[in-house]
UniProtKB/Swiss-Prot annotation:
<feature type="binding site">
    <location>
        <position position="435"/>
    </location>
    <ligand>
        <name>hybrid [4Fe-2O-2S] cluster</name>
    </ligand>
</feature>
<dbReference type="InterPro" id="IPR004137">
    <property type="entry name" value="HCP/CODH"/>
</dbReference>
<feature type="binding site">
    <location>
        <position position="494"/>
    </location>
    <ligand>
        <name>hybrid [4Fe-2O-2S] cluster</name>
    </ligand>
</feature>
<keyword id="KW-0001">2Fe-2S</keyword>
<keyword id="KW-0560">Oxidoreductase</keyword>
<dbReference type="InterPro" id="IPR010048">
    <property type="entry name" value="Hydroxylam_reduct"/>
</dbReference>
<dbReference type="GO" id="GO:0004601">
    <property type="term" value="F:peroxidase activity"/>
</dbReference>
<dbReference type="Pfam" id="PF03063">
    <property type="entry name" value="Prismane"/>
</dbReference>
<feature type="modified residue" description="Cysteine persulfide">
    <location>
        <position position="407"/>
    </location>
</feature>
<dbReference type="InterPro" id="IPR016099">
    <property type="entry name" value="Prismane-like_a/b-sand"/>
</dbReference>
<dbReference type="GO" id="GO:0050418">
    <property type="term" value="F:hydroxylamine reductase activity"/>
</dbReference>
<feature type="binding site">
    <location>
        <position position="275"/>
    </location>
    <ligand>
        <name>hybrid [4Fe-2O-2S] cluster</name>
    </ligand>
</feature>
<comment type="similarity">
    <text>Belongs to the HCP family.</text>
</comment>
<dbReference type="InterPro" id="IPR016100">
    <property type="entry name" value="Prismane_a-bundle"/>
</dbReference>
<feature type="binding site">
    <location>
        <position position="8"/>
    </location>
    <ligand>
        <name>[2Fe-2S] cluster</name>
    </ligand>
</feature>
<protein>
    <recommendedName>
        <fullName>Hydroxylamine reductase</fullName>
        <ecNumber>1.7.99.1</ecNumber>
    </recommendedName>
</protein>
<keyword id="KW-0411">Iron-sulfur</keyword>
């Protein structure tokens, strides 16, 4: 059987249409796993439909609320490739739905839900049979009837909500829980399960998702800073230090903290990878002296870089790609919602097996000459610099600020972002976040009167800090955010980037430039609508874009 998936930037694009519709997608996801993820999403939509009904009766089920976004997160690009675990999530979704349904019936014997997903049952234990059942829920099944524009808007909402669900899970891990956010999530998820076909309603839904995600990023920020302190500028070594070692990748700061606690005094050094780099800026994480540095570059290079790393690797969230290519599948471990067939999975917070493996491996034989980069420009630090930025602008020492960030990826056209960064004039500042920074974060950019020209604000979710800074600057200057000498040039790859974009658009931010390509699920008509309404456009050339943005 074949699949249909068009959720990431590297999806196959042909004159006949966009999307991976083969035996395997560009990410390495098999048709089986992709189809079973469609089935899981349908089960989660049914669960959310009953959660909406339960809310009408004043019933809030925390097990449902904690599970639903986490399971949805497992379908995000480069997270879980393990078909049996995807089916396990679907079974758990149905079991929770039935328990929630029973709670509703106990209050009202006539309780019912009018949603096509509300009574979904899995037809078999056989993966092949389940894959055939999943064909009923493939996202483009009614494309001929509704057209590409409606399908594209549905997917914009589905993928945006998926990105928000990922951030909800990150926040939940840190003890952050908001009943209103979960209620809104269930309402949108259930509605998407009705296969809506009204263009205006779908556009409104996409903005609602963006607004909801702003709240999610707020509680995630509170969770991270509440537990680990506010990030402050910190130098990080990106070269090897002699000794045994473990590499930890993803976004989960709690996993990193637990690993650091358990490795303290063992002689094992810990390195961050990818989106874990900003962890070095948090006081409660950098206090561990054996958190010695950051290893590697963008996630897409992991098959080469992980193969060279002389210790075990822990994946706490996206992005994982096939570890068998570099023959390190015997020393990569997955956590939480991450999965790869045949790779060992850590069900809890005990990293002792990983530590034992690290102690049995060679580690780095010698320390390389250090190369230091600076991270840790968190929300408090950025807000503390607001008056300095305004002063520099007023004295014409600072002409423009470019927010240059987002996801990285393998496409060659992404060199645009390196070229753009190195072409930014000396009297301009670069604010960066997310893993797209690896395209230029090891380069030297100098400073403007002591203020670094390259300011690393953190992970993708730390777009929240950048938004708060922009709002603060606008308030102090008595203007709107769109009137600031500020331009957003964003790279995208997966669904977290989609929901960040929806968040910015829902807040009224205009004239954003994105690349390296437009999302494959957005038709020319939809791109035209977004351009007309928000000024959203794709990158062209560095020279043309720089000229246009500086003259705006």
């Amino acid at each position: 059987m074949i699949m249909f998936c068009v959720q990431c930037e590297q999806t196959i694009r042909t004159p006949a249409g966009n999307g991976c519709s083969y035996a395997q997608g560009m990410c390495g996801k098999t048709a089986e796993t992709s189809d079973l993820q469609d089935l899981l999403i349908a089960a989660l939509q049914g669960l959310s439909a009953w959660a909406v009904k339960a809310c009408e009766y004043g019933i809030i089920n925390h097990d449902v609320d904690s599970f639903a976004p986490r399971a949805f997160f497992s379908t995000l690009t480069n997270v879980n490739f393990d078909s049996p675990r995807i089916v396990g999530y679907a079974r758990e979704a149905i079991a929770l739905r039935e328990a929630l349904k029973a709670q509703c019936l106990a209050v009202d014997a006539n309780a019912r839900v009018d949603n096509p997903m509300a009574d979904l049952q899995l037809v078999s234990d056989d993966l092949g049979e389940l894959q055939r059942q999943a064909a009923e829920f493939t996202p483009n099944k009614d494309k001929a009837a509704i057209g590409e524009n409606i399908l594209g808007l549905r997917l914009l909402c589905l993928y945006g909500l998926k990105g928000a669900a990922a951030y909800m899970e990150h926040a939940h891990v840190l003890g952050q829980y908001d009943n209103d956010i979960y209620a809104q999530y269930h309402k949108i998820m259930a509605w998407l399960g009705t296969w809506p076909a009204d263009m205006n309603a779908l556009l409104e839904c996409s903005m609602e998702i963006g607004q909801m995600n702003f709240k999610v990023m707020s509680i995630l920020d509170a969770g991270e800073t509440g537990k680990y302190g506010h990030p402050t500028p910190t130098q990080v070594n990106v070269k090897a230090t002699a000794g045994k070692c473990i590499l930890i990748s993803g976004h989960d700061l709690k996993d990193l903290y637990n690993l650091l606690e358990q490795t303290e005094g063992t002689g094992v050094n810990v390195y961050t990878h990818g989106e874990m780099l900003p962890a070095h800026g948090y006081p409660e994480l950098r206090k561990f002296k054996h958190l010695v540095g950051n290893y590697g570059s963008g996630w897409q290079n992991q098959q080469v870089e992980f193969a060279r790393f002389p210790g075990p690797i822990v994946m706490t969230s996206n992005c994982i790609i096939d570890p068998t290519v570099g023959a390190y599948d015997d020393r990569i471990w997955t956590r939480s919602i991450v999965g790869w067939p045949g790779v060992r999975h850590l069900d809890g917070d005990d990293f002792s097996a990983v530590i034992t493996q690290a102690q049995q491996m060679a580690g780095f034989p010698y320390s390389e000459i250090p190369h230091l980069i600076t991270v840790g420009f968190g929300r408090q630090t950025l807000l503390g610099a607001a008056d300095t930025l305004i002063d520099l602008v007023s004295r014409e020492k600072l002409r423009h600020i470019f927010l240059l960030g987002g996801c990285d990826g393998a496409r060659g056209e992404r060199h645009y972002f390196t070229d753009f960064a190195t072409s930014v004039p000396d009297d301009c500042l670069i604010l960066t976040l997310a893993c797209g920074k690896y395209r230029f974060n090891k380069l030297e950019f100098g400073d403007i009167e002591g203020l670094p020209r390259l300011v690393d604000a953190g992970q993708c979710n730390d777009a929240y800090s950048a938004i708060i800074l922009a709002v603060t600057l606008a308030e102090k200057l008595g203007c709107g955010v769109n009137d600031l000498p500020l331009s957003l040039v964003l790279s995208w790859f997966e669904q977290k980037a989609i929901v960040i974009l929806l968040t910015l658009l829902s807040l009224g931010v205009k004239n954003i430039v994105t690349g390296p390509t437009a999302p494959g699920f957005l038709t020319p008509d939809l791109l035209a609508v977004l351009n007309e309404k928000f000024g959203l456009r794709s990158i062209t050339t560095v020279e043309e874009d720089m000229k246009q943005l500086l003259s705006a």
